[in-house]
Amino acid sequence: MYALVEINGKQYKAIEGEFLKIDKISPIEKDKLEFNSVLLINKDGEIKIGKPYVANSLIRCTYKEDKKDKKVVSYRYRRRKSSERKVGHRQTYSYILVDEIVF
């Protein structure tokens, strides 16, 4: 059983009992998470599609931890001007465990 859920403007595939890597969430929301913006639910081949969301559906999750992703390096070089710029960035993600999908 899996569901497509919209979290902070992005869509994720949520499977019961598995971890979900989402963009970092605020510390206020970190105890027990419930998302009601479910776009699609697939249970044993039976598919329910929302318009835009599936009515009376909910995904319950548990917050686990925040981690940083690999560093992404941006490099800019301007020829013949003795000018270069190198910038690194590490995106922070939150890992949540999908406890159950209710519909």
From Swiss-Prot:
Signal sequence interval, chain numbering? none
- Kindly give the InterPro entries that the UniProt entry links to this protein: bL21-like (IPR028909), bL21-like_sf (IPR036164), Ribosomal_bL21 (IPR001787), Ribosomal_bL21_CS (IPR018258)
The protein depicted here goes by the name Large ribosomal subunit protein bL21
Q: List the disulfide bonds.
A: none
What protein family does this chain belong to? Belongs to the bacterial ribosomal protein bL21 family.
**What does the protein in this record do?**
This protein binds to 23S rRNA in the presence of protein L20.
Q: Which GO terms describe its biological process?
A: translation
Cite the entry's keywords alphabetically. Ribonucleoprotein, Ribosomal protein, RNA-binding, rRNA-binding
Q: How does it assemble?
A: Part of the 50S ribosomal subunit. Contacts protein L20.
Q: Which domain of life is it from?
A: Bacteria
Q: Which Pfam families match?
A: Ribosomal_L21p
For this protein, the parts annotated as crossing the membrane are: none
NCBIfam families according to UniProt: L21 (TIGR00061)
Q: Which GO terms describe its molecular function?
A: rRNA binding; structural constituent of ribosome
One GO cellular component this record assigns the protein to is: ribonucleoprotein complex
